């Protein structure tokens, strides 16, 4: 994997900051504000991990926004091997937020009985927490809206990590459409980050001058380099 300069990278950049925590104002996305600048959004999915204030687990930017703020932000307690804060300790915060990055809405449409713009998700009366027992809230938004109960196990709800386990076919299609012709995330498929770094193995193959013994305090060598 290559960084924006073409150098080999793990994709992880660590930054020391004097900011005790960050919020949803995107300061974490700018070096000048205590965070770290985004890599080019056409080539990389930027994920910032930091201390988020207010009990927030994470947030994301939908496709089509400003490139220098594009990506996902996750509280350090809820991601990686450091994330050990149940019931959000299985990585589903990243799954949920990357879902937003890939154009998925909350399954309840951010409104009572709202729409998430996906036809095969049942209508939800609201967000759900914990881990309800299935079937749950059958037809809570009216006859036929959720005959098998609301899909609280969907990654785009707010239930516990060990309760989430599904994207629907419609959600999958909505995400994949971003990588089709004209899609907002299409450029990621030809990302410069996937180009192997150029091996920096140049060396001196011959010394043209000086030759023999040379006792001057300074020299201007002429050499042949080969990569």
What positions do the PLM features span?
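Extracellular/luminal regions of secreted and cell-surface proteins that mediate adhesion/ECM remodeling
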Residues: 195-227
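Extracellular (secreted or membrane-anchored) zinc-dependent metallopeptidases
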Residues: 1-5, 10-200
